[in-house]
UniProtKB/Swiss-Prot annotation:
Domain notes: Consists of three domains: the N-terminal catalytic domain, the editing domain and the C-terminal anticodon-binding domain.
Protein task: Catalyzes the attachment of proline to tRNA(Pro) in a two-step reaction: proline is first activated by ATP to form Pro-AMP and then transferred to the acceptor end of tRNA(Pro). As ProRS can inadvertently accommodate and process non-cognate amino acids such as alanine and cysteine, to avoid such errors it has two additional distinct editing activities against alanine. One activity is designated as 'pretransfer' editing and involves the tRNA(Pro)-independent hydrolysis of activated Ala-AMP.
One Gene Ontology term of the molecular function aspect: aminoacyl-tRNA deacylase activity
HAMAP family: Pro_tRNA_synth_type1 (MF_01569)
Protein name stated in the entry: Proline--tRNA ligase
Compartment(s) of residence: Cytoplasm
Record gene name: proS
Similarity section: Belongs to the class-II aminoacyl-tRNA synthetase family. ProS type 1 subfamily.
NCBIfam families: PRK09194.1 (NF006625), proS_fam_II (TIGR00409)
Keywords: Aminoacyl-tRNA synthetase, ATP-binding, Cytoplasm, Ligase, Nucleotide-binding, Protein biosynthesis
Gene Ontology terms: cellular component: cytosol
Subunit structure: Homodimer.
EC annotation from Swiss-Prot or TrEMBL: 6.1.1.15
Species the sequence originates in: Clavibacter sepedonicus
């Protein structure tokens, strides 16, 4: 099949879009694949749809290979099933909510777990109907606070979501592994590097969750790896907890004057100058307990202050804090929050003062106090004394203060020990390209999805959920393969097999180009033919680079002698070839 560029609905651009942050966004717009309609919302043009359809075709082939069957749900759905599982509230402002003319609450679906479960409940009633895997490729909607990077993080996006249904946990494990293996094949066919990491389940819930992350410097996620094979999203990383320390015999806590210590380092310097350690070792930032006040907004709209104690050489990671306090929204407390709690002395906050406990549910402030896992019983700290200009030395956990709980909210760094003992971790950036969940019985229980088992007993079905971002994967392939001059698609999803560029005004050249296109078409190749008569060769070559078909055939003056040029966009090499041999050479290379 051939497509004439003179007839194709496309307009390439010389200038970058002003809001483009990453190469894929810039080039997909300039090459005429997508056009912005609103923040995070894009129209798909013919070139873009060709690539998108090929990504979807790969996904469909791999789903069919494992026996998953395709269905299709509406994007506009009633809110009630989401309310039944609690996700209507858990999604918070990220869910598009609306009402119909009868004032019934509706949503634009972010995911479809509830409705897949209800469909199976409506149709199946016996274990003999299971296992079942069904999927759809559907547009999803999430009201992102900050849409960015073009189609990498938009408010409308296309996703493949699959769901498995089993009546035993062993069956779920088999279904989960089949989907996991299919995902690996999909990403290999797309040519995307990936790392499988342990992940937090978030609003989805469930007993097991793994992400497929594509390592990229533009990634929004941080993940960690160890030499021994441990891998996790930083949000799911768990700190290796040190052993408790004997409390008996430790020095008593003592308050010391510490004016003009606006930073941890100035506090450490002052402590070393005025209060040297008895063991001769210098105080370090890791000996201090930094107490950070966070404001949590709960689902019912109430606002709660929580103080998190972390070692002073660490910082709060708000993404990890959001996981720790899910489903509440988390932000740093402001001066107004502190003003309402005069017991919290800014710059000198700590769990204890000379008057007694300050933080914790049983303290004078009643402010919840949670700590990093490294704050074990017997650990001794320098921290605030809740009096302006004063800190306390040798404040011992389990003796002088008892936190309300432990949370993973501190940042994770290169060299931290992996929790499984497999060595020091290294951190990297990545973007999620797929996510698989063992949901267990969360949704089935909430929605009453049961079947009769082998003994005639009603049992709750166990589910798995498996998502791949179609449009996100397309953008990441574009990002990973572009060469600075333009897009450079892998053959598996290129919009065309070959791009024929005709140059010159000689009628013989035009005839030769037409005959070549016919021969390529007859050979089963999908051809983009740049037949534009009044466009210069330089513009045509620039557009060929932008559009990104990996193989270009240039038909120019040499055509009168039966010759053309093969331009390999991957290597940028041009090779003379007889026109009569072009079709054979390209079909042999497929």
């Amino acid at each position: 099949m051939s497509t004439r560029l003179s007839k194709l609905f496309v307009r390439t651009l010389r200038e970058d879009p002003v809001d483009a942050e990453v190469a894929s966004h810039r080039l997909l717009v300039r090459a005429g694949y997508i056009r912005r309609q609103a923040p995070g919302i894009f129209a798909w043009l013919p070139l873009g749809l060709r690539v998108k359809n090929k990504v979807e075709a790969i996904v469909r082939e791999e789903m069919e290979r494992i026996g998953a069957q395709e269905v299709h749900f509406p994007a506009l759905l009633p809110a009630e099933p989401y309310q039944a599982t609690g996700r209507y509230d858990e999604y918070g402002p990220g869910m598009f909510r609306l009402e119909d003319r009868k004032r019934a609450p509706m949503v634009l679906a972010p995911t479809h777990e509830e409705f897949f479960a209800l469909l199976v409940k409506d149709l199946y009633s016996s274990y003999k109907d299971l296992p079942l895997s069904i999927y759809q490729i559907q547009d999803k909607y999430r009201d992102e606070a900050r849409p960015r990077a073009g189609i990498l993080r938009g408010r409308e996006f296309t996703m493949k979501d699959a769901y498995s249904f089993d009546h035993t946990d062993a069956g779920l494990a088999v279904s989960y592994q089949a989907q996991r293996d299919a995902y690996e094949r999909i990403f290999q066919r797309l040519g995307l590097e990936y790392v499988i990491v342990a992940a937090d389940a978030g609003a989805m819930g469930g007993s097991k969750s793994e992400e497929f992350l594509h390592p990229t410097p533009i990634g929004e996620d941080t993940f960690v790896r160890s030499p021994g094979g441990y891998a996790a999203n930083v949000e799911a990383f768990t700190t290796l907890v040190p052993e408790s320390i004997p409390i008996e015999g430790q020095p008593a806590a003592r308050v010391f004057d510490s004016p003009d210590t606006p930073t941890i380092q100035t506090l450490v310097d002052l402590a070393n100058a005025r209060e040297p350690r008895e063991d001769g070792r210098a105080w370090t930032a890791a000996d201090t307990l930094k107490n950070i006040v966070l404001a949590l907004t709960h689902l019912d709209g109430t606002r709660e202050l929580v103080v998190v104690g972390i070692p002073g050489d660490r910082d709060i990671d708000l993404k990890r804090a959001e996981v720790a306090f899910f489903p509440a929204e988390v932000e740093a407390a402001n001066d107004g929050d502190l003003a309402k709690n005069p017991g919290l002395v800014k710059g000198y906050i700590g769990p204890w003062s000379p008057e007694g406990p300050v933080l914790g549910s049983t303290s004078s402030t009643k402010v919840r106090y949670v700590v990093d896992p490294r704050v074990v019983d017997g650990s001794s700290w320098i921290t605030g004394a809740n009096v302006a200009g004063k800190h306390v030395l040798s404040l011992v956990a389990g003796r002088d203060f008892t936190p309300d709980g432990v949370v993973e909210a501190a940042d994770v760094r290169d060299g931290d020990p992996a929790p499984d003992g497999s060595g020091p971790i290294s951190t990297a950036r990545g973007t999620e390209i797929g996510h698989v969940f063992e949901l267990g019985r969360k949704y089935a229980e909430a929605l009453g999805l049961k079947v009769l088992d082998e003994n005639g007993k009603l049992v709750t079905v166990t589910m798995g959920s498996y998502g791949i971002g179609i449009t996100r994967n397309l953008a990441l392939v574009a990002e990973a393969t572009q060469d600075g001059r333009g897009l450079l698609w892998p053959a598996s999803i290129s919009p065309f097999d070959v791009h024929v560029v005709m140059t010159g005004k000689d009628p013989a050249v035009g005839t030769a180009a037409e005959e070549l296109v016919d021969a390529l078409d007859a050979a089963g190749l999908d051809v983009l033919f740049d037949d534009r008569p009044k466009v210069s060769p330089g513009v045509k070559f620039g557009d060929a680079e932008l559009i990104g078909v990996p193989t270009v055939v240039i038909v120019g003056r040499g055509a009168v002698d039966g010759m053309a040029e093969l331009w390999d966009r991957r290597t940028n090499e041009r090779t003379p070839v007889a026109l009569a041999d072009v079709a054979g050479a390209l079909t042999a290379a497929r």
